[in-house]
Amino acid sequence: MDYKDTLLMPKTDFPMRGGLPNKEPQIQAQWDEKKLYEKILKKNEGRTPYILHDGPPYANGQIHMGHALNKIIKDMIMRYKAMNGYYAPYVPGWDTHGLPIETALTKKGVDRKSMSEAEFRELCRAYALEQIELQKADFKRLGVNGDWENPYITLQEKFEAEQIRLFGDMAAKGYIYKGKKPVYWSPSSESSLAEAEIEYQDKVSPSIYVAFDVLDGKGLVDDDVKFVIWTTTPWTLPANVAIALNKDLDYVQVRVNDTSYIVAQALLDNVCDAVGWDKEGVQIEKTFKGADLEFVKARHPFIDRESLIILGDHVTTDAGTGCVHTAPGHGEDDFIVGQKYELDVISPVDGKGVYTSEAGEFEGMYYDKANKVITEKLEASGHLLKLDFFKHSYPHDWRTKKPVIFRATPQWFASINKVRQDILNAIEETEFKVEWGKTRIYNMIRDRGDWVISRQRVWGVPLPVFYAENGDIIMDKAVIEHVATLVEKHGTNVWYEREATDLLPEGYTHPGSPNGVFTKEKDIMDVWFDSGSSHRGVLEARPELSFPADLYFEGSDQYRGWFNSSITTAVATRGKSPYKKLLSHGFVMDGQGRKMSKSLGNTVLPEKVVKQMGADIIRLWVMSVDYLADVRISDDILKQVSEVYRKIRNTFKFLLGNVNDFNPATDAVPYAELVEIDQFMLNKLYTFVNNAHKHYDNNDYLFMYQELQNFINVELSNFYLDYGKDILYIEAQDSHVRRSMQTVVYEVLTSLTKVLAPIIPHTADEIWSHTPHVTEESVHLADMPEVQSVDTALIGKWNHFLEIRDDVLKAIEETRNDKVIGKSLEAAVYIQAKNEEDQALLKSFDNLHQLFITSYAEVVDEPQGTDYNLSNVLVKHAEGEKCERCWNYSTVLTEESHAHPHVCPRCLSVLESK
């Protein structure tokens, strides 16, 4: 007889196959239709706010996996906070000014010189907004929940106005100044660069040793002696005005082939090796302390100019000669030491890297090509001691990938010195997940120079500065506020569309402009000043947000970028950090740990993965990686994640299928009346949920991923749900033992769905839509399951039982291999524990055979089988015949003539109760 229809088999419409690429857009359309983001905010209105401030990605180009990693973790954080009772608005942002957009337009064929600056800026604006729409669609497709209709954008008039006001506040406090100073300069971009825009790449440079003749030895050094310098930038020699020594080092005057030279004693051997001097033939004539040689004068090797001997702490014995070529116009250390000695700042190179008339005979030559010409000139005059070439790490423009130079130009600076200690104090008060994050930003602030905030471009926020006829700088607070008001109304193009007098307050006068003539600054602000002002233009400006934010979370490159500029401007103007906590993630590499690049063909694009596998697969991958370090992704890695997803989905299908006839309002069993194994599984669930809260709060998603797999695969699938089939399918529908188990299955189903909702939001909402008797229209409007106290004694008891059960499973497997049995229900188990406590534990169960998933189990007092870890186990083929309904073996089955033939007493009882 076929008893299939008498079994309570799982029933659910929840499909086995995810079909995420097609299903996710439908779910997202429902979210938009329901105005889910607004409903989530409404639900938590008036509760404790949690503010994660979005670091703005640059509005140019397709999003990559680094963007996906960043946005998905932010979304996981905010979805969890919202489900955990926080008012958690998420306002995405975009960074929109700067060179890449200008370059992108040029590549599209825009001829900048054929139009006005204002017209070119309009094209830049339109391009940026177009890019934002493309990126926005990609971010939304990843399931990122936020105020996408009202993002903040650095080109918005209100944002730009607040940025100008922030500049005004810093100027009023004396933190803004103009000076000629060597800055990182990119000839390929024709602009100065901030430290954050520099990346290091290998470069081959000339290495030359040059002799400078003594001009005035101050009675210490003879006139025919030469100082030896070493440099890898021969092109900077036209700007040389000094040679720096270290006051504490010993210097030696040595005789080599009838000529005397001065070098640091500690470097003499190195110099001999480098220039080819025979060490045996080198005679030390005199020894000096560096301090003794201060103010000795040398002669420039090819320009009629003195080169003063000065002292500087930056001179070391790490390399070179201990005598350092000093050009204040081309080096930061040179500039600093040069200020002390009031040296001329000579920088005879223009914005394109071409020598100016100040370079004399080299005028019109590109700086890099001058290396060869200058070296040849030195050789011809006998000043070149050695030329070599070597590969070293050299600063490059992070956008054009071309080398940069140090070049002294008139620039605007934000003083770091004046606020450095305050920023360091603010860092001390900031929370960091990892200590190295704190060390990194602390050291960067401690060691950084003043911040170059000017750029020689047009697409950006203008520096709101005017000049009087006599050259006086005008930075009055009232003037800057007037400009901010104009910008708030008309946007920053007003700066380019109006004359200086029309940008100043009506009737404005200045003693430096007797004729009422003014000019305006042409430079724009560094883009890091744009995004670094977002705490003012966004956190303080938007009513749903607040300053300081609870969290800033970006890639680890932002310690020198956005984290740095933000805390600098916030401390300078508000006296405190804009973030309470700082968290960072690593970079996304390929499966072998290599950087992704088109040339290697190893790029994995979010768009492609979403189309092939779905966004929830990318999100589950994000959960699975240690994001604090660099992470790896590849097709193989994503396939592994897909397998984990499939297992999760199958588990949910089973859970849903077994509560189709369960109503928690009428069928749930109180905890005290639950069958003990169900109490155990409920406590296991509580443990998982409690840990999930802890991991969410600590941003430890990898730990949660590992515990999730253990809970689903080991606790549920391998044990509880496997054991449960004999109850859920076989027992009477309304029996206590079945309702007890359904109570726990339902709790596992709803709790697990909620816990996973921030991770795989599409799948979680799909599960929720198939879950009977839930009241919320979306899982994202539900509350996270609460932290519960756990019965550790009960868990300990059952965990130990499961260890004994492992012995039984091994014995069953061995018996199956010996072909004694097939399925485990064909087995009868005879077990004796190795100690009295375990023996008593086994005897306390009245359904041991069910727990072993066998037809029979008996606790025996004498060992009959094989010794295992905790017990002695014998497995035989079960006696009797197979019940045609439950497939358990029984020695008592109904006869063929019975109304319900060939069933065991338990099944007969169930059938007769219907």
Curated annotation (Swiss-Prot):
Signal peptide: none annotated. ATP binds at K598. It is found in: Cytoplasm. Its cofactor is Zn(2+). A motif ('KMSKS' region) lies at residues 595-599. It is an enzyme of class 6 (ligase). This is Isoleucine--tRNA ligase. The lineage of its organism: Bacteria, Bacillati, Bacillota, Bacilli, Bacillales. The gene is ileS.
